């Protein structure tokens, strides 16, 4: 549905910190978004995490979920930027390695003023690798 260039029109993240390659589904009415990240050995973080045993840092998986959510809720929010406010109930189930494709599935639980609460899961080959609940605020740039 959205490619990388279209994603970059909606959120401020750029390489090497853009952690979603494509938005597959975006349901504004039901406040749900599904995104994808193709993980390659060329990712900057693999230089140090871990040499000879590359594993994607879990916090970056959570960040990828949040970026997908940002694409959904930042639609029409010119001059605004989403900031993390809290992360809760984070669980990492399995490592993510080069060659994996992560599917992020994120749903808004509540929006109040400029505060967004959501939950998401990350899957590789339909197996859950991570889950989290998070809060962020939408603020002026």
Stretches found by the model and what they are:
Residues 30-32, 96-100, 107-141:
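HotDog/MaoC-like acyl-thioester-processing domains
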Residues 21-24, 88, 93, 107-109, ...:
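Conserved positions in beta-strands of structured domains
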Residues 17-19, 102, 116:
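Hydrophobic core residues within well-ordered beta-strands of beta-rich domains
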Residues 8, 52, 92-94:
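Beta-strand-rich interaction surfaces with strong enrichment in secreted/lumenal proteins
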Residues 1-14:
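Short aromatic-glycine motifs in intrinsically disordered, low-complexity regions
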Residues 23, 56-79:
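Active-site helix/loop of acyl-thioester processing domains in fatty-acid/polyketide metabolism
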Residues 15-56:
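Catalytic strand-loop segment that frames the active site of acyl-thioester-processing enzymes
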Residues 1, 68-103, 129, 133-137:
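Hydrophobic beta-strand-centered segment that forms part of the acyl-chain substrate-binding groove
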């Amino acid at each position: 549905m959205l490619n990388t260039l279209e994603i970059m029109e909606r959120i401020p993240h750029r390489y090497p910190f853009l952690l979603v390659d494509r938005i597959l589904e975006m349901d504004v009415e039901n406040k749900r978004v599904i995104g994808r990240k193709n993980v390659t050995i060329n990712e900057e973080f693999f230089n140090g995490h871990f040499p000879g045993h590359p594993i994607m840092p879990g916090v970056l998986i959570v960040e990828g979920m949040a970026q997908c959510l940002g694409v959904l809720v930042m639609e029409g929010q010119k001059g605004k930027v989403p900031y993390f406010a809290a992360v809760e109930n984070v669980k990492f189930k399995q490592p993510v390695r080069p060659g994996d494709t992560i599917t992020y599935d994120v749903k808004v639980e509540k929006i109040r003023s400029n505060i967004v609460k959501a939950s998401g899961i990350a899957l590789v080959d339909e197996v859950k690798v991570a889950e989290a609940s998070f809060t962020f605020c939408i603020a002026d740039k």
